[in-house]
């Protein structure tokens, strides 16, 4: 569910409390249908960026899997914010995709800052909680499709086992593939 200010729910509506009544109706419906709740909370500093509220939500629905998009969307030089967010959302039912990290950090290929964000996320959460994602075609304005995976595939910061979990095993687990 895209709730961001840019192109999501809050781009066209007033601020919606992610832990409010209206959203709980959506979460409950998703849980009742056995869905994985994928949520993009937008960028830091926007009214849609409600990590505190989301932490309460994931605790209220422990049987439902959540995937938080963009690793909570850290921008350039926001490692401390990333660490805080990951610790706050570190629950058994919460996973993270890493789509658009290179775009968010605005660094040139091989996107070393994005690599360091993924490395830190694995250190905090473990290798089983992070899913690769590209955010294509939207990310085409920043990098090629090959670069969107090669920056991690070719990185020396990750073991082969970690890469297999990131690119393959975790998605199978989360989405029951």
Residue ranges and their predicted role:
Residues 1-44, 97-101:
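Active-site gating/metal-coordination segments in enzymes
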Residues 3, 41, 71, 135-136:
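Active-site metal-binding loops of divalent metal-dependent hydrolases
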Residues 23-33, 55-62, 83-93, 120-126:
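Acidic (Asp/Glu)-rich catalytic clusters
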Residues 30, 70, 96, 135, ...:
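Conserved, mostly hydrophobic/aromatic
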Residues 34-38, 65-67, 93-97, 129-131:
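Structural preference for beta-strand elements that scaffold enzyme active sites
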Residues 48-54, 76-86, 106-116, 140-152:
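Histidine/acidic-residue-rich catalytic or RNA/ligand-binding cores of hydrolases
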Residues 86-123:
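Aromatic-anchored helix/helix-loop segment that forms the rim or "lid"
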Residues 119-120, 124-131, 140-177:
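Mid-to-C-terminal alpha-helical segments outside catalytic/metal-binding sites
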């Amino acid at each position: 569910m895209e709730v961001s200010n840019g192109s999501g729910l809050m781009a066209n509506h007033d601020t919606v409390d992610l832990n409010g009544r209206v959203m709980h109706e959506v979460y409950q419906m998703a849980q009742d249908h056995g869905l994985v709740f994928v949520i993009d909370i937008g960028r830091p500093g926007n009214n849609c960026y409600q990590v505190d509220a989301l932490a309460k939500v994931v605790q209220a629905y422990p049987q439902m899997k959540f995937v938080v998009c963009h690793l909570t969307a850290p921008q350039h030089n926001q490692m401390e914010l990333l660490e805080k967010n990951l610790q706050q959302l570190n629950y058994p039912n919460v996973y993270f995709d890493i789509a658009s990290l290179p775009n968010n950090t605005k660094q040139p290929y091989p996107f070393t800052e994005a690599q360091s964000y993924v490395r830190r996320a694995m250190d905090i959460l473990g290798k089983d909680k992070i899913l690769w994602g590209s955010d294509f075609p939207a990310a085409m304005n920043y990098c090629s499709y090959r670069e969107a995976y090669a920056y991690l595939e070719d990185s020396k910061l990750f073991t082969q086992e970690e890469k297999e979990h990131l690119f393959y095993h975790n998605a199978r687990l989360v989405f029951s593939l």
